[in-house]
Amino acid sequence: MFACLVLKGSQKTGACLGTTLSHYHLRSAFTLIELLVVIAIIAILAAMLLPVLSKAKAAAQNSQCINNLKQWGLATHIYVTDNNDFLPLEGRGTGTPLQSDLDNPTYQAWYIQLPEVLKLPRYVEMPWRTNDAANLGRSVWICPANQRRVVAPSINLFHYALSVGFNGTGTNQHSPIKLSAIPVAPTVVVWLFDNGQKPALGDGGSVTNIHNNGANFSFLDGHVKRFNKSEYWNGTSVGITNNPDLVWNTFP
């Protein structure tokens, strides 16, 4: 038997307490259908937001990559100013020759001289260079969109490579060249770029398409620009070599 409530000053008996509580609980709880509707709405919103968040992340990574390349460009021009117009060398890509270069702080390769200009730790001091489990962190060496890591027995990881043809040879050489001696406008001469391999130098076939099916390039004048894959890649080992806005080999 349920107790009934009578409102003070009222002539009528109120609803029974048991009936009132039962009615309250029935109205306050979600039905299965209502719960499924809520879940469906959340799923739809998540599906709408994920692409937006993904694009925002990609844009942030691209921005950081561009900033890295601009810093390398700035370091290059400071180096040129301090070294009688001479550019740093492209160096050597892998193995024992690279290691011998890294052990020589006076060697003129870009990966030795430019960090010094920027007052950054030397490349040989980077823990991720030999340890694929090391935290990459935020570094001018690292493009946040590049997932490449060290794979044993490799001892190097370059997310950015220097164009092997800027001196006109198309191969790594060990004689420095002056910026003013390059017969092509510095605004179109490729300097550093997003590296799809791991050596410190490369050509059009080394570029990686990690920024919305494109890549970032720095040029000898210091500016940085993103190009679509179709502008530098044609499926060959060296990529497109006749794009006037991306000059790889500076001497005819």
What are these language model-derived features?
Residues 65-252:
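Short, well-structured segments within or immediately adjacent to enzyme catalytic domains
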Residues 1-32:
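N-terminal leader/signal peptides at the extreme start of proteins
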